[in-house]
């Protein structure tokens, strides 16, 4: 299955947990969630608004935009590639009786670092 996301900002976090869970109804096993873009990432963490803002602020401090990275000579988005590299492009979650076996506060979060764009997320039940 594939999800299509339309991001609205250059940098944002979108909770895709419910969409992924709909993809695995009546399944058991594992689900692989993968983003095929080099300027996006996937993580599992709490979806509380303050934490999401903290994550974005932390990533910006860690890898600031427009700091003269070599790749910026081509596309002005080197920071987005570096941020995505640090976080990774996939997560794997156990599925039990059609439900994601996530912890109480855990959510699957899609991170956009070079939007706004239309993005794909591949969801593969294993």
UniProtKB/Swiss-Prot annotation:
Belongs to the UPF0047 family. Pfam families: UPF0047 (PF01894). This is UPF0047 protein AF_2050. SUPFAM superfamilies: YjbQ-like. It comes from the Archaea. PROSITE patterns: UPF0047 (PS01314). Disulfide bonds: none annotated. It comes from Archaeoglobus fulgidus (strain ATCC 49558 / DSM 4304 / JCM 9628 / NBRC 100126 / VC-16).
């Amino acid at each position: 299955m594939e999800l299509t996301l339309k991001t609205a900002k250059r940098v944002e976090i979108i909770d895709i947990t419910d969409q992924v869970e709909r993809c695995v109804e009546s399944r058991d096993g594992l689900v692989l969630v993968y983003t095929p873009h080099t300027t996006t990432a996937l993580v599992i963490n709490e979806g509380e608004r303050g934490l999401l803002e903290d994550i974005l602020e932390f990533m910006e401090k860690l890898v600031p935009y427009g700091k003269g990275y070599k790749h910026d000579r081509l596309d002005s988005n080197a920071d987005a590639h570096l941020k995505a590299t640090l976080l990774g492009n996939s997560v794997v979650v156990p599925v039990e009786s059609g439900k994601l076996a996530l912890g109480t506060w855990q959510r699957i979060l899609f991170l956009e670092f070079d939007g706004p764009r239309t993005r794909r997320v591949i969801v593969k039940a294993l």
